[in-house]
Amino acid sequence: MKQRFIKYICLSILGEMAISFYILADTFFIAQGIGDKGLTALNLAIPVFNFIYGIGLMLGIGSGIRLSILKIDNKHDEINQVFDHTVLLGLVIGVLFMITGLLYSPSLARLLGANDAVLNDTVTYLRTIMIFTPAFIFNNALNALVRNDNNPALATTAMIVASLMNVVLDYIFIFLCHMGMFGAVFATCLAPIIGLSILSLHFMKKKNTFHPVQLHFQFSIIQRIIKLGFPSMLIEISSGLVVLLFNTLILKITGNIGVAAYGVVCNIWLVCIAIFNGLAHGMQPLTSESYGSHDTKNLIMLRRMTLTISLLLSSVIYLTVFTNASMITSLFNKTNNPTLYKLAIEGFKIMFIGLFFAGVNIVLTTYFTSIESAKIASTLILLRGVVLIVPASIILSQFGMKGIWSSLPLSEIITTCVGIIYLKLKRAMN
C-alpha cells in the first residue's frame, strides 16, 4: 500500500501542478507581452475559470469515488452508468456556460469589477474561456476517472503534456503571432483538448473498467455524483470568490496596480495549493478503496502519512518563497513598477504563512469526502472559503494591504482547528 501511495501522490502532484501552470503561464506571458493592464484583466476573470474547473472536479471526483467503491463489488454495469451520467451532466452544464459566455461576457466583466481601462481584455478572456467550457469540464472529469481506474500515469501524462503545450502556444500566439489577450486565452483553451486526446487512450486499455453504454437515466446517480464531488467544486468556487472579494477590496485601496500585484501573489499561491491538491487527490482513490473494503488500519495510515507530507512540503515551500520573493516578483514586473514590487513582496511574506494550515485543510477535506462524509468536508470548505475569509478580509482591510494579506492565514488557522475537532469526533464515533 505504501508503494502505491507514493506512486499515486507523486503522479497526482505532478499532474495538478501542470494544470495550475495553465494560468501561471498566462500570467507570465501576459505580464511580459501585455503588461499591468493585462495582469489586472486576467485576475478579474480568474473566478470564472475557478468555477468551470470546479465543475469538472465535481464530476470527476464524485464519479471517481463511486467507481472506486463499486469496483470492490465488481458492479460493472453501475460503473458504466455512472460514466454515462457524468458525460450527460458535463455536456448540459458546458452548453449553458457557452451560451452565457457568448451573450453576457461584457455584463459579467463589469460585475467582476472591470473598469474601462481593462474591460476589453477581460471580456476577451471570459468569452473565450466560457466557449471552451465543455473541454475544461470533460478534461477534469475524465482525468479523475482515469486516475481512479488504476491508471494514474496516463492521467498525469495528459496533464503535463497539455500544460507544456499551453506554454509553447502562449509564446507562439503572444510573441510570434501578436494575438494579445486572445492569444493567451486561446492557448489555455487548446490545452484541455490536447489532454482529452491523451486520456482517450484509456478506452483502448483492456483493464479499463468503464465504457460508454446505453444510458438508463436515473436522477439518483446524478445526485450521488454531485453529493460526493460537491466538496471538490466548493473548494474551487470558494477560491474564486476569495479572488473576487480581494479584487473588490484591493481596487478600493490601491486600484488596478494593487490587483495586478495580488494577481502575481495569487497565481504563485495557486501553484503551491495545486501541490496539496495533488497530494490529496493522490490519496483519494486509495482512501476510497480502503473505506469500501472496511480497512480501518490502512485508512489511518494513509491519513497520517498524507498529513505529515503536507506539513513537510509547507515548510519547504514557505522557506523557498520567503527567501526568493523579490526574484519571483521581478519575473512578473516587466515595467519595474515600484508599487507592484513592494505590494507583491509584502503579500508573499504574509499570505504564505497560511500555507501550513491550507495544506492540512485540503488533506482533511479530501479525506472526509473519500469516506463519504461530504457534509463535514463541505463545512470545512465553507469555513475557509466563505464564512471566515469574508468577514476577516472586510474587517482587516481597514488596515490596508497588510490586513488583506493577513486575512487568509487567519481563516486557514481557525479552519484547521475545526477540522481537527471533527476528526477526533469521527474517530470517537467509530
Which residue stretches match the model-derived regions?
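Small-residue-rich hydrophobic transmembrane alpha-helices
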Residues: L39-I99, F136-A155, A261-L319, A325, ...
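Transmembrane helical elements of multi-pass membrane transporters/channels
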Residues: K7-D26, T128, N139, A162, ...
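Helix-terminus/linker motif at the lipid-water interface of multi-pass membrane proteins
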Residues: F21-T40, A109-D116, I172-M179, G240-N267, ...
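Short alpha-helical transmembrane segments in multi-pass integral membrane proteins
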Residues: M1-I13, L67-F132, L176-F230, T287-I353, ...
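Structural signal for membrane-spanning alpha-helices in multi-pass inner-membrane proteins
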Residues: T27, G101, A144, D170, ...
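Short runs within selected transmembrane alpha-helices of multi-pass transporters and secretion channels
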Residues: G60, T128-R147, A155-N166, A184-L199, ...
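Small-residue hotspots at the loop-to-helix junctions and early N-terminal turns
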Residues: D36-P47, T122, L126, V185, ...
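N-terminal transmembrane alpha-helices
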Residues: M1-I34, P47-G62, R66, L91-M98, ...
